């Protein structure tokens, strides 16, 4: 029936690094000062209609602050919440973190990998901000061909901050590319001013995965004009992508955005279920996804000061996960139960 780890009925990403490397690896969110091509006029202006990046990263991660300082402060921040964490992943999260010349990207990525407690990088970006040369470099980094002496230097790193030896199973820096795809529907992507198509996303994911780079994707549930049925229909397309992991976030209406004005003008254009309905909706999605796809997140949190309403109240992610486990058991269902190999193509 199902044989997922951690006693789950879905393929939870929780514990993935512990199983692979023998310890928990915590992410440190960084702001490296990037922008996006739909903000600076390259493919558009104003950015995505739902976006205010300040709502999505912690206080220690601020533009202009040196990256190694962000890492040190991030480690101190995370040690309060996760005191047993010993090594970290540098998470380039703000805006599009491959949007720049390759020489600049190399300098930034290799700078954070020089930190003695950082064992890998997670790069959040857009599918229209990668190319063959950038992906070849990342593949070389992940395989150990680039920075060939990195692991030896890390294991010999002096200093009181190093708490534990590097896992023996680690042979090169961990490299993950996480694409903001947001929707499989081109009409939605145009509506929210993304500036790229789903086919662009498909090609980027395929180019990344075929090089052996761990590849993830992010989707928003409830964008304007998308019905529950449309969101379920895209599960086949998501499963057809060579992704290792996926994140789902419910749409949150962030103050000061174009989408806040749009929502105020016509709330009926948005599918925004209450928490109870959302749990069933997420399960309906899980049932239709291929079972080997890791589920990294099923809901998002934004600090209350950034959102114009909180239909669920102040429910934390860990509580949502607890309720999800309970509901899966009540429905006696699991990830992939209704999965079938999708046909090729895309929705419009």
Language-model segments: what does each one mean?
Residues 1-89, 348:
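N-terminal [4Fe-4S]-dependent radical SAM core
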Residues 2-15, 21-26, 253-348:
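Auxiliary Fe-S-binding modules of radical SAM enzymes
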Residues 26-30, 88-90, 121-123, 175-179, ...:
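Hydrophobic faces of well-ordered beta-strands that scaffold small-molecule active sites
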Residues 54-74, 82-102, 117-130, 148-151, ...:
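Core AdoMet radical
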Residues 102-110, 131-142, 231:
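Distinct, well-ordered alpha-helical segments
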Residues 106-110, 227-244, 301-324:
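Short, electropositive alpha-helical surface patch
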Residues 152-163, 171:
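Short Gly/Ser/Thr- and charged-rich N-terminal loops/segments
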Residues 199-259, 276-299:
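Conserved C-terminal portion of the radical SAM core fold
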């Amino acid at each position: 029936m199902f044989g997922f780890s951690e006693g789950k009925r879905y393929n939870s990403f929780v514990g993935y690094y512990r199983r692979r490397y023998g310890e928990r690896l915590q992410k440190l969110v960084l702001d490296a000062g990037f922008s996006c091509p739909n903000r600076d006029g390259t493919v558009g202006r104003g950015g995505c209609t739902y976006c205010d990046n300040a709502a999505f990263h912690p206080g220690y991660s601020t533009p202009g602050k040196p990256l190694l300082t962000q890492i040190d402060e991030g480690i101190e921040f995370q040690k309060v919440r996760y005191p047993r964490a010993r090594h970290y992943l540098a998470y380039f999260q703000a805006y599009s973190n491959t949007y720049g010349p390759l020489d600049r990207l190399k300098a930034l990525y290799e700078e954070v990998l020089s930190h003695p407690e950082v064992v890998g990088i997670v790069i959040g970006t857009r599918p229209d901000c990668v190319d063959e040369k950038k992906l070849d470099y990342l593949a070389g980094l992940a395989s150990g061909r680039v920075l060939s002496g990195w692991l030896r230097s890390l294991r010999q790193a002096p200093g009181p901050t190093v708490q534990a030896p590097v896992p023996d199973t680690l042979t090169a820096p961990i490299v993950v590319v996480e694409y903001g795809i947001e929707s499989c529907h081109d009409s939605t992507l145009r509506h929210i001013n993304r500036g790229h198509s789903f086919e662009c996303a498909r090609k980027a994911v395929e180019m990344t995965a075929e090089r052996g780079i761990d590849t993830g994707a992010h989707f928003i549930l409830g964008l304007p004009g998308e019905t529950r049925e449309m969101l379920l229909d895209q599960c086949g397309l998501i499963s057809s992508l060579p992704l290792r992991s996926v994140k789902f976030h419910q749409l949150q209406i962030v103050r000061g955005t174009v989408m806040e004005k749009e929502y105020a003008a016509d709330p009926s254009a948005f599918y925004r279920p209450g928490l109870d309905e959302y749990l069933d909706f997420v399960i309906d999605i899980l049932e239709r996804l291929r079972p080997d796809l890791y589920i990294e997140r099923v809901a998002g949190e934004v600090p209350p000061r950034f959102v114009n309403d909180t239909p669920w109240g102040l429910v934390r992610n860990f509580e949502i996960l607890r309720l999800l486990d309970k509901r899966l058991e009540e429905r006696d269902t699991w990830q992939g139960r209704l999965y079938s190999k999708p046909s090729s193509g895309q929705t419009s």
